[in-house]
């Protein structure tokens, strides 16, 4: 058998001499001989295939959500957020779908409901809410705008019975007065101006605090810009803005929804109610993040 030296193999394989010596020392090239301090390598040796380094799994929430969404990975944090946020936010607005039914729709894209009368809108809005979550993940780093907010409403309400009503403006601001919790909201003629002013004030600072995000939510719900769907759109916005600003997001679950409503009602006089509710929800979300090995700063 004919042997060659390290420099010849390095030139042949387009590698550094150091790399070739490392291959020899680690037994990656069959048949090599160490003659004193010189490696003798079979002339017909095959260049070792370098193993690709395993990609490091992102440990920040937004990157992981995007990665799992794009790869279609089941059972991860993306899967968890889709089911928990959709179920709880829709349930607050009167959806009668159970948690298991919500999960089944997400996982199988089928209904699978027997011997039960189910409102079609509950199913449509559940599927639509999944798409809304995809939207806030994809566009999380973009500044909040009227166009984005209207787009969320359009996605949420498309294909529902509301969308077939001539007076209901899907993806557009309300045409008729409405109330929230018995309290007056912005007049339809004033909504556009109030939303522009709200967004202008909010977007003055680049890095938002949790309190600023909650303040925006309070003002958004007070305006109540859409005919219906304001609560869900508002909570989606809070989740998106937490992602954008590196703040642990949160999901308002059924057992704390009354505290959430009280917090909204009392925000102007006592901000502690709403802050405490959101911090409680945040602590619960941190349990998810700990489980999936994700870091958080707050």
Please report, for each region that a protein language model flagged, where it lies by residue.
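FIC/Doc superfamily catalytic core
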Residues: 1-13, 17-29, 34-298
């Amino acid at each position: 058998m004919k042997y060659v030296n390290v420099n010849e193999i390095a030139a042949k394989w387009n590698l550094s001499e150091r790399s070739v010596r490392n291959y020899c020392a680690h037994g990656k090239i069959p048949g090599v001989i160490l003659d004193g301090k010189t490696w003798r390598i079979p002339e017909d040796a095959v260049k070792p295939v370098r193993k690709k380094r395993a990609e490091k799994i992102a440990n920040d929430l937004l990157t992981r959500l995007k990665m799992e969404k794009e790869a279609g990975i089941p059972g991860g944090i993306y899967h968890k957020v889709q089911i928990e946020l959709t179920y709880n936010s829709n349930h607050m607005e009167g959806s009668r779908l159970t948690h298991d039914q919500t999960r089944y729709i997400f996982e199988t894209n089928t209904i699978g409901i027997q011997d039960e009368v189910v409102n079609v809108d509950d199913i449509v809005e559940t599927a639509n809410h999944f798409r809304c979550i995809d939207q806030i993940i994809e566009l999380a780093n973009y500044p909040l705008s009227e166009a984005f907010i209207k787009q969320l409403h359009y996605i949420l309400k498309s294909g529902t019975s509301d969308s077939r009503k001539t007076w209901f403006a899907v993806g557009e601001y309300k045409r008729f007065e409405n109330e929230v919790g018995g309290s007056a909201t912005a007049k339809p003629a004033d909504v556009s101006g109030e939303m522009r002013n709200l967004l202008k004030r909010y977007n003055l600072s680049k890095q938002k605090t949790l309190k600023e995000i909650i303040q925006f939510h309070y003002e958004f719900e007070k305006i109540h810009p859409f005919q219906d769907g304001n609560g869900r759109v508002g909570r989606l916005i809070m989740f998106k803005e937490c992602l954008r600003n590196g703040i642990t997001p949160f999901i308002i679950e059924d057992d704390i929804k009354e505290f959430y409503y009280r917090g909204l009602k009392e925000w102007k006089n006592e901000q502690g109610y709403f802050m405490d509710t959101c911090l409680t929800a945040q602590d619960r979300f941190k349990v998810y993040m700990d489980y999936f090995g994700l870091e958080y700063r707050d």
